[in-house]
């Protein structure tokens, strides 16, 4: 259910400052968004997977906290990443 190494590398290359930038808030938010989108398609098929749904809610919460941090520290990057990922904020 997780992303492949190639998918993660592509996300890091797109949102990171360089190829090894995996810790920046932008990259973490983009990776969480990709995982959340992947899990949403999983739950369309497996409606009773409550344990997995709990993990999804945890990811959403972690992404929300990272977005709040980014908004507090760098509003321009926050606005950019919201637009690039198509989030509703």
Swiss-Prot record:
This is Small ribosomal subunit protein uS15. Disulfide bonds: none annotated. SMART domains: Ribosomal_S15. The keyword RNA-binding applies. HAMAP family: Ribosomal_uS15_B. PROSITE patterns: RIBOSOMAL_S15. One of its GO terms (cellular component) is cytosolic small ribosomal subunit. GO terms for biological process: translation. Keywords: Ribonucleoprotein, Ribosomal protein, RNA-binding, rRNA-binding. The gene is rpsO. Belongs to the universal ribosomal protein uS15 family. InterPro entries: Ribosomal_uS15, Ribosomal_uS15_bac-type, uS15_NS1_RNA-bd_sf.
